[in-house]
UniProtKB/Swiss-Prot annotation:
Cellular component GO terms held in the UniProt record: cytoplasm; extracellular region
Residues noted as binding substrate in the record, renumbered to the chain: 85-86, 169, 197, 275-278, 282, 305-307
Keyword terms, alphabetized: Acyltransferase, Cell wall, Cytoplasm, Disulfide bond, Secreted, Signal, Transferase
UniProt xrefs under InterPro entries: AB_hydrolase_fold, Esterase-like, Mycobacterial_A85_antigen, TAT_signal
Keyword Secreted annotated: yes
Name assigned to this protein: Diacylglycerol acyltransferase/mycolyltransferase Ag85A
Keyword Transferase: yes
Family under the similarity heading: Belongs to the mycobacterial A85 antigen family.
Signal peptide annotation: 1-43
Length: 347
């Protein structure tokens, strides 16, 4: 019996309210990682791109953090691409599942893909992040807003401010929160298929289930109990006023759970996208209500919780990113042997 069959059987005959809650809990707890999440065609960029594998010191986390990096040229702006809940420790999901480095080669934008951070929400946790693999320190916000930009500025001639940040699923809300609290660094934030009201309703409980499944982590170690102010602090729908006041350029995408020819025609991918769509519409209402006028909204007539849709959005936003960040297309090394290459599949 497949995972999807077990899910169908478990909810058969249940009242609709309980079906939605149970299915949402199951899917948000990581089943998408097991039965969905197909890669974009041509995943991993072609060999010969100037991609480097950096080991960036982090005093906040007490270790070096691997960052996949492609230069956009001297004094170029940066684009930080953040991974999903099941982020791996070998490569960033954007590289595993899409040819993102190839798409942005010669774009005038330096691309930085931090590696790791499973279930982290790219946040500074209250407590050590203890999971199935042991305990570590998660201070991702500090790393992304202080340590990494300082390193890239000093070592790679990347502008430390005026950057963009784009995340999918878990990291979509993270991208908006990073921009809300660090407006000089992140003038552009993209959220793709994210839950944008995580502190509200069943959000804390579902996130706790998801983190438990994706690595065995505890949400309370991250932001405390659901009544803790950290939950509201990291809720984009409650911090939308900051994005409006900052005049941050935002790009928000969410499908409706109906697959297109891009793929993702499986129950978890379809259900999860439909599940998070409501929070995206709610966020749009809050943004407009706060007087926001610097947003791109892509609420498509199709789209499931899957990489081909996120890859299409990253390609679509490229001209907008270049314009907002002031990139100079054509800047940066055209081709080079990858530094410390490790995946043998292109980067």
């Amino acid at each position: 019996m497949t995972l999807v069959d077990r899910l169908r059987g478990a909810v058969a005959g249940m009242p609709r309210r309980l079906v939605v809650g149970a299915a949402g809990a199951a899917l948000l707890s990581g089943l998408i990682g097991a039965v969905g999440g197909s890669a974009t065609a041509g995943a991993f960029s072609r060999p010969g791109l100037p991609v480097e594998y950096l080991q960036v010191p982090s005093a906040a986390m007490g270790r070096d953090i691997k960052v996949q990096f492609q230069s956009g040229g001297a004094n170029s702006p940066a684009l930080y691409l953040l991974d999903g809940m099941r982020a791996q420790d070998d490569f960033n999901g954007w590289d595993i599942n899409t040819p993102a480095f190839e798409w942005y080669n010669q774009s005038g934008i330096s691309v930085a893909m931090p590696v790791g951070g499973q279930s982290s929400f790219y946040s500074d946790w209250y407590k050590p992040a203890c999971g199935k693999a042991g305990c570590t320190t998660y201070k991702w916000e500090t790393f992304l807003t202080s340590e990494l930009p300082q390193y890239l500025s000093a070592q790679k001639q990347v502008k430390p401010t005026g950057s963009g940040v784009v995340g999918l699923s878990m990291a979509g809300s993270s991208a908006l929160i990073l921009a809300a609290y660090h407006p000089d660094q992140f003038v552009y934030a993209g959220s793709l298929s994210a839950l944008l009201d995580p502190s509200q309703g069943m959000g804390p409980s579902l996130i706790g289930l998801a983190m438990g499944d994706a690595g065995g982590y505890k949400a309370a170690d991250m932001w405390g109990p659901k009544e803790d102010p950290a939950w509201a602090r990291n809720d984009p729908s409650l911090q939308v006023g900051k994005l409006v006041a900052n005049n941050t350029r935002i790009w928000v995408y969410c499908g409706n759970g109906k697959p297109s020819d891009l793929g993702g025609d499986n129950l978890p991918a379809k259900f999860l996208e439909g599940f998070v769509r409501t929070s995206n519409l709610k966020f749009q209402d809050a943004y407009n209500g706060a007087g926001g006028h610097n947003a791109v909204w892509n609420f498509d007539a199709n789209g499931t919780h899957d990489w081909p849709y996120w890859g299409a959005q990253l390609q679509a936003m490229k001209p907008d990113l270049q314009s907002v960040l002031g990139a100079t297309p054509g800047a940066g090394p055209a081709t080079a042997a990858a530094t410390n290459a490790g995946n043998g599949q292109g980067t």
